[in-house]
């Protein structure tokens, strides 16, 4: 049992409470060998540079414990009220060396997560357990852990993930030389493990309690020695560190006020001049020339790169001088750099609101030209003579208002205003800006040096002087003061800056655009003969000295060159021009006689400001083009004006205007210098980032030569207006223009970039290993150099757990790209259930098509790229919109991530279904196994299955060859039965056998009707011979001819008879078929009508598919088109705006573009999120339909098609699923009056009978009898007693209630109308969704319009066909065959005389014989009687009687 008591108080600042038992003893820290190096090495881990530093933290300066138990079981120690916990390996005096170590477990409790440090036991005894090699630190959400059963393998179950596990080495020989520990606060945890520190960004509520598990005594000889010593720390302590010439020294800092102030305000810059993490930025402010930021995160260019930090305890009375150029950094703390100093920051590092500066304080600013201006403040309104009195700038809290002036030679030049009530920082830039607490208090000419005299007063505070340079950084501001800085100096930090967060969560982020910097200028113009004009504008300034300020006289003069004896207007008449300004300055005292030079504070220069023109004066020579350009001193006819001002050391005054008359075009161009003559002034810098001006279109990009040939056009743009390419008219070569850097998505895991997805195959973000996917290139820290996986799709052999996912792919911690594991199923189960429908009497089967969207294509938008297109100045302006881009990008990313998770959990993959989905594999032998494996299959590897339907080759030839068809004429005639075949077989091909081989058909002699040439010659000769020899009794020669003729005539007559019979049979059969055809066409008409409806349904489904697929493309297309909108700016091109205007004027114009484009992005994101919400509901509907329609049979009428559901099939479709519902549609109904039950009485009681089966309906027929019928089909039958259930009574109870009370009566009651209304109210937007018209967009675009129109046309055509078929059926019914019968002549042929003679002879011969046989034979016949008599007389004595002999069988 563990007894928790209070055992120890450490009375420094707080206390530590712990368990008390005899197992734990205090250990003198000096008894730990090597301990003198532990603290030093520990403190100097993050202090790598030279200098002095005070660090504070929960360091191991308290009591060490050595805990062990003599029991066999483990024991626990509980630490409370601590902020850090440390432990060390066994290193006791007189230790036996390699002692048997015990397991260690440290559990730091918190919410929602806790920390567990676990080290397993190590031994090398007979049990052969290996020496301990590793320990583990992990983050867990488990509130409680079973310490007794906790093993080294169980950490996989309780740790959150690989990004929250830190394995570390623990070697027994490191006794006392390594310090292990944990220090935590609400924002992060620092783990000191194996000479390394790990910072884990964890936002957590820590209970400041630690549970320690320790084991029984080891084999070390020292009493109560154990494997580890422990220390819980509750006190915050400071150490003063010093590192000089490689020598390290440290000491405990005991002056609390000094140590606190030093640690808070002094730091040692790291390599590169960066301020280290953890610095408090006490009294550091963000410098601004306009309004001051109160709170938020901003990416800005600030003087935060420290070249030298000089901690100054105090100044003497003597003045100190600080110069920007040639500064000698001899007292720097930390590194010192030789960079150009932009701003010197004086940080007044006091911790209490006291007045620090007590002496005379005057800031002297040595400006350009040697003029020294002084800034001082006074506690009261003073006269001019009083400026020579003692002024001051009190540092800290002032005791009253202070009025500040700019002085020159003791005379006030300008009143600056009232000093802030508390001065904590003064920053002065070399460009003449003077900041107090970050606010631009005063601006003048550039400054060379600063001097002031100051004493620190009575507060004892000290200064830090920081020589800084401007750098881009993410600055977190709270209450106008800097709290945290993240430098945008690396790839990962650039992403942090673009996302406006110092801590990146795991995910995909758009890669920030890189700074282009100074690049070459490319210009493309049409070749022309150029004439040049130089326009010299002269400005004569007249300056006067007022009481407190220098003013420009309105008599200052502006002079234009003379043109046509006119000096008021000057127009450009050449096609090139350059504008130059020359200014002079004269001064006077109080009159208007300007005859003195402008010296000292009267020195002024003339500047021409933008005014109302859409371009700046100093950009006119930057290849701006016009059709007309004139300068005028009068406003008549002017399009805009330029302001002319005098700039002095203290202010800037507008004293006149220069008016401009212009027309936009390309005829006149402003150039930096004279290039007159016949020239092609085009200058191209190929294959490198360049600032271009191509035919008046400006921007930054890479120009490359292409092989394309385009006949028309000079330049080519996208829908958004961006330049895609141009053509050189001299040689016709077409060049492409691409951005200097392309947008990419970086995969960030655990604060580091592990991979990036990009559209081009080019190294980026320092990643060199790459692979390809169907949609993008992927660069990674994972080694994709193997030939097997480089340049291929995702490597399926990579086995790792993805940390982040994008669509169906994931990225592991090692940067490898893997497929998301999908859930597999073995097969589909499709149970069948009865539907709930009306009572139809007849059905028709219909297939109805339904499409349901399941997912949307994830969209990632690089907001900064969309808004600014990589323009660095625009990117800086964009940071003023705080987290606008971050919100847009995170909304899309989180929506895509959520949808991806839902889809992954929804979809299952069946391997069988996946195989059958392939047309090539559908009929393959493997998939048809075992039924068709032994048979050839159609559609598989061969077409053997067709052999049974091909004509077979017979061995006996029944046809002529092709050669015979060529050599002989083929005559086809109608024949009688087998007459022709018998004739051919008998004749054997001999023509002379014609008459001999005559055949007989129904007793009539016939010959085939066709005779060849030989037969005709033969019979002609017979006829001729008969005619010639007729007088000589030779007419018999013509007999063969006559017989043959008659035989062939008989053949024809018999043919006619057969034809007549066939004609009658055909007519009867055709008339009978007409009725069948009429019925068939009626059914075809119905089928086509149903097909027409089906095609219409398919067309609607395809239209929905097209709408779903193209909706996102339409939105993206509209989003792209918005880039052409200038949103009331002078141009939609940011580069063009900065090319025309000065920076301040251009910022105002670009701000309009940023606002408009962010609004368009917000509208797109809102529409996308709304669409995702709709798809989420649609996805659930699809899931329900798969379960109810595909995997079972729905009982709901209309849910799975409009009818009684039979079965459904589902198939994949773009972005969703398409269902084919087979349903029964009732075509006829039987209307019955249904009864809910029967109420009966027998006099003494009343009871009710209700139908037991709810699938049956009880109704009363017209014959007054009751019947039962199923509700799915009208099949009435007489009810039986087994169909009813008796109930107690017949009373029906109705409950009166409102709709509001229904849920309390029926818990699952849902008011559909009210629910829909509530949903509409909840999802009603408070913004206006813009109309997103359909436009062509360079993205995946599904154009099914033609197919849908074709389906609709076919459906309409089928409908028209049904109408035509109806008419045709009527015509067929009226068309019956009525054939005219051919006359059939029956001729009876008499038998010849010899036949009758033969018949008579047969009769004469046969009748006597028959009579004789009948009358004379037999036992009673005459012959029989006579024979008997003769036999008895003649044979009586010859034959004796004998006994019959029987058969004898011998065996």
From Swiss-Prot:
Sequence segments annotated as region (Interaction with host ANPEP): 660-803
Sorted UniProt keywords: Coiled coil, Glycoprotein, Host membrane, Host-virus interaction, Membrane, Signal, Transmembrane, Transmembrane helix, Viral attachment to host cell, Viral envelope protein, Virion, Virulence, Virus entry into host cell
Transmembrane segments: 1393-1412
Free-text function comment from the UniProt entry: S1 region attaches the virion to the cell membrane by interacting with host ANPEP/aminopeptidase N, initiating the infection. Binding to the receptor probably induces conformational changes in the S glycoprotein unmasking the fusion peptide of S2 region and activating membranes fusion. S2 region belongs to the class I viral fusion protein. Under the current model, the protein has at least 3 conformational states: pre-fusion native state, pre-hairpin intermediate state, and post-fusion hairpin state.
InterPro entries listed in its UniProt record: ALPHA_CORONA_SPIKE, CoV_S1_C, S2_sf_CoV, Spike_S1_CoV, Spike_S2_CoV, Spike_S2_CoV_C, Spike_S2_CoV_HR1, Spike_S2_CoV_HR2
Gene that specifies this protein: S
Membrane topology: Single-pass type I membrane protein
Residues in coiled coil: 1106-1150, 1340-1382
GO biological process: endocytosis involved in viral entry into host cell; fusion of virus membrane with host endosome membrane; fusion of virus membrane with host plasma membrane; receptor-mediated virion attachment to host cell
Subcellular locations according to the entry: Virion membrane; Host endoplasmic reticulum-Golgi intermediate compartment membrane
The protein's name: Spike glycoprotein
Presence of keyword Membrane: yes
Annotated spans, S2: 780-1451
Stretches of the chain found on the membrane's Intravirion side: 1413-1451
Top-level taxon in the UniProt lineage: Viruses
Region feature Fusion peptide, mapped onto this chain: 1024-1045
Major localization class: virion
Annotated Gene Ontology cellular component terms: host cell endoplasmic reticulum-Golgi intermediate compartment membrane; membrane; viral envelope; virion membrane
Native species: Canine coronavirus (strain Insavc-1) (CCoV)
Virion surface side: 32-1392
Notes on the domains: The KxHxx motif seems to function as an ER retrieval signal.
Keyword Transmembrane helix listed: yes
Signal peptide: 1-31
Region (Heptad repeat 2 (HR2)): 1307-1404
Family the UniProt entry places it in: Belongs to the alphacoronaviruses spike protein family.
């Amino acid at each position: 049992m563990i007894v928790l008591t209070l055992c120890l108080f450490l009375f420094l600042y707080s206390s530590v409470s712990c368990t008390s038992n005899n197992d734990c003893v205090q250990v003198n820290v000096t008894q730990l060998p090597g301990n003198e190096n532990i603290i030093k090495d520990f403190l100097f881990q993050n202090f790598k540079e030279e200098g002095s530093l005070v660090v504070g933290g929960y360091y191991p300066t308290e009591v060490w414990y050595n805990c062990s138990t003599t029991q066999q079981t483990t024991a626990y120690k509980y630490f409370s009220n601590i902020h850090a916990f440390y432990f060390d390996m066994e290193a006791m005096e007189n230790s036996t060396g390699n002692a048997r170590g015990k397991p260690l477990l440290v559990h730091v409790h918190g919410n929602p997560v806790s920390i567990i440090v676990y080290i397993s036991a190590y031994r090398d005894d007979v049990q052969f357990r290996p020496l301990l090699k590793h320990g583990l630190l992990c983050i867990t959400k488990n509130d409680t852990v079973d310490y007794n059963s906790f093993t080294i393998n169980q950490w996989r179950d309780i740790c959150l993930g690989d990004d929250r596990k830190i394995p570390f080495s623990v070697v027994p020989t490191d006794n006392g030389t390594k310090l292990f520990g944990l220090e935590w606060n609400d924002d992060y945890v620092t783990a000191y493990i194996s000479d390394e520190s790990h910072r884990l960004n964890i936002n957590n509520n820590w209970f400041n309690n630690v549970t320690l598990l320790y084991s029984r005594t080891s084999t070390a000889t020292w009493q109560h020695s154990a494997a580890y010593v422990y220390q819980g720390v509750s006190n915050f302590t400071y150490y003063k560190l010093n590192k000089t010439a490689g020598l390290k020294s440290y000491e405990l800092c005991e002056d609390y006020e000094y140590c606190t102030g030093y640690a808070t305000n002094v730091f040692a810059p790291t390599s590169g001049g960066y301020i280290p993490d953890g610095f408090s930025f006490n009294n550091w402010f963000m410098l601004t020339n306009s309004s001051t930021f109160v709170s938020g995160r901003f990416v800005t260019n600030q003087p935060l790169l420290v070249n030298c930090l000089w901690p100054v305890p105090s100044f003497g009375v003597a003045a100190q001088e600080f110069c920007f150029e040639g500064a000698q950094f001899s007292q720097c703390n930390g590194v010192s750099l030789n960079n150009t100093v932009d701003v010197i920051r004086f940080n007044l590092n006091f911790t209490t609101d006291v007045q620090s500066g007590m002496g005379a304080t005057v800031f002297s600013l040595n400006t350009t030209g040697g003029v020294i201006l002084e800034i001082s403040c006074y506690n009261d309104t003073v006269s001019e003579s009083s400026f020579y009195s003692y002024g001051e700038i009190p540092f800290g809290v002032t005791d009253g208002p202070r009025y500040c002036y700019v002085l020159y030679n003791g005379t006030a030049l300008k009143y600056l205003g009232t000093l802030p009530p508390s001065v904590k920082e003064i920053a002065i830039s070399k460009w003449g800006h003077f900041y107090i607490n970050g606010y631009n208090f005063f601006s003048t000419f550039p400054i060379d040096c600063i001097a002031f005299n100051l004493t620190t007063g009575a507060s004892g505070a000290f200064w830090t002087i920081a020589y800084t340079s401007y750098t881009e950084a993410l600055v977190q501001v709270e209450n106008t003061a800097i709290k945290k800085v993240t430098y945008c100096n690396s790839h990962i930090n650039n992403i942090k800056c673009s996302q406006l967060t110092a801590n990146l969560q795991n995910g995909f982020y758009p890669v920030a655009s890189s700074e282009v910097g100074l690049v070459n200028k490319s210009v493309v113009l049409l070749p022309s003969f150029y004439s040049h004009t130089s326009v010299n504008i002269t400005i004569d300034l007249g300056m006067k000295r007022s009481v407190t300020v220098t003013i420009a006289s309105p008599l200052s003069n502006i002079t234009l060159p003379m043109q046509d004896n006119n000096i008021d207007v000057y127009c450009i008449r050449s096609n090139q021009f350059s504008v130059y300004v020359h200014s002079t300055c004269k001064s006077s005292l109080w009159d208007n006689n300007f005859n003195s030079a402008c010296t000292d504070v009267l020195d002024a220069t003339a500047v021409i400001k933008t005014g109302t023109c859409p371009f700046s004066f100093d950009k006119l020579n930057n290849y701006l083009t016009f059709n007309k350009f004139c300068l005028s001193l009068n406003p008549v006819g002017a399009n805009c004006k330029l302001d002319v001002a005098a700039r002095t050391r203290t202010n800037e005054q507008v004293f006149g205007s220069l008016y401009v008359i212009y027309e936009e075009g390309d005829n006149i161009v402003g150039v930096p210098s004279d290039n007159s003559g016949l020239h092609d002034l085009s200058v191209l810098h190929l294959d490198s980032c360049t600032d271009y001006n191509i035919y008046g279109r400006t921007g930054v990009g890479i120009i490359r030569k292409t092989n394309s040939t385009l006949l028309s056009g000079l330049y080519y743009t996208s829908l958004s207006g961006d330049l895609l390419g141009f053509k050189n008219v001299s040689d016709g070569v077409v060049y492409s223009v691409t951005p200097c850097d392309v947008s990419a998505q970086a995969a960030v895991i655990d604060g580091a970039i592990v991979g990036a997805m990009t559209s081009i195959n080019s190294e980026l973000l320092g990643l060199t290993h790459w692979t390809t996917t169907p949609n993008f290139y992927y660069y990674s820290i994972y080694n994709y150099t193997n030939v097997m996986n480089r340049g291929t799709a995702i490597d399926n052999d990579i086995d790792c757990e993805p940390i982040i996912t994008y669509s169906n792919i994931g990225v592991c911690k090692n940067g490898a790209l893997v497929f998301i594991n999908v859930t597999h199923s073995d097969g589909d189960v499709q149970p069948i259930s009865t539907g709930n429908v009306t009572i139809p009497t007849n059905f028709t089967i219909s297939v109805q098509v339904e499409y349901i969207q399941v997912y949307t294509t994830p969209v990632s938008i690089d907001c900064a790229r969309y808004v600014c297109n990589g323009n660095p100045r625009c990117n800086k302006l964009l940071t003023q919109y705080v987290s606008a881009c971050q919100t847009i990008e995170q909304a899309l990313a989180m929506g895509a991530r959520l949808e991806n998770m839902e889809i992954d959990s929804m979809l299952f993959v069946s391997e069988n279904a996946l195989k059958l989905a392939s047309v090539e594999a559908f009929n393959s032998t493997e998939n048809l196994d075992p039924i068709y494996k032994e048979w050839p299959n159609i559609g598989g590897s061969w077409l053997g299955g067709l052999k049974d339907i091909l004509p077979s080759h017979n061995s006996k030839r029944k046809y002529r060859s092709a050669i015979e068809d060529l050599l002989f004429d083929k005559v086809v005639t109608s024949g009688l039965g087998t007459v022709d075949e018998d004739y051919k077989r008998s004749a054997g091909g001999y023509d002379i056998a014609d008459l001999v081989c005559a055949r007989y058909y129904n007793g009539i002699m016939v010959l085939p009707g066709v005779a060849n040439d030989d037969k005709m010659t033969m019979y002609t000769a017979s006829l001729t011979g008969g005619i010639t020899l007729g007088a000589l009794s030779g007419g018999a020669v013509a007999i063969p001819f006559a017989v043959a003729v008659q035989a062939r005539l008989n053949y024809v007559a018999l043919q006619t008879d057969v034809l007549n019979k066939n004609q009658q049979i055909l007519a009867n059969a055709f008339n009978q078929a007409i009725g069948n055809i009429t019925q068939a066409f009626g059914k075809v008409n119905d089928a086509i009508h149903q097909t027409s409806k089906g095609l219409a349904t398919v067309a609607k489904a395809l239209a929905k598919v097209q709408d779903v697929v193209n909706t996102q493309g339409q939105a993206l297309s509209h989003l792209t088109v918005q880039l052409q909108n200038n949103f009331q700016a002078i141009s939609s091109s940011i580069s063009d705006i900065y090319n025309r205007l000065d920076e301040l004027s251009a910022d105002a114009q670009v701000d309009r573009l940023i606002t408009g484009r962010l609004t368009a992005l917000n509208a797109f994101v809102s529409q996308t999120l709304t669409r995702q919400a709709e798809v989420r509901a649609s996805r659930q509907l699809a899931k329900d339909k798969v379960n109810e329609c595909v995997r079972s049979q729905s009982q709901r009428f209309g849910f799975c098609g409009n009818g009684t559901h039979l079965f459904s099939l589902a198939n994949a479709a773009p972005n969703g699923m398409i269902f084919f519902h087979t349903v029964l549609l009732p075509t006829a109904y039987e209307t019955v009056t249904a009864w809910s039950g029967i109420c009966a009485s027998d006099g003494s009681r009343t009871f009710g009978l209700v139908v037991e089966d709810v699938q049956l309906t009880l109704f009363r027929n017209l014959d007054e009898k009751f019947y039962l019928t199923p509700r799915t089909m009208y099949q009435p039958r007489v009810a039986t007693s087994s169909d009813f259930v008796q109930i107690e009574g017949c009373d029906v109870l109705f409950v009166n209630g409102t709709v509001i009370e229904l849920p309390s009566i029926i818990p699952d009651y849902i008011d559909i109308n009210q629910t829909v209304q509530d949903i509409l109210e909840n999802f009603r937007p408070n913004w206006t969704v813009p109309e997103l018209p359909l436009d062509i967009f360079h993205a995946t675009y599904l154009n099914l319009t033609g197919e849908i129109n074709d389906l609709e046309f076919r459906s309409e055509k089928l409908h028209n066909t049904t109408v035509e078929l109806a008419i045709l059926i009527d015509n067929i019914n009226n068309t019956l065959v009525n054939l005219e019968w051919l006359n059939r002549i029956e001729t009876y042929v008499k038998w010849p005389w010899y036949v009758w003679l033969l018949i008579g002879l047969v009769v004469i011969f046969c009748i006597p014989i028959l009579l004789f046989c009948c009358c004379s034979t037999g036992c009673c016949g005459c012959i029989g009687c006579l024979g008997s008599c003769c036999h008895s007389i003649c044979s009586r004595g010859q034959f004796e009687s004998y006994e019959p002999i029987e058969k004898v069988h011998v065996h």
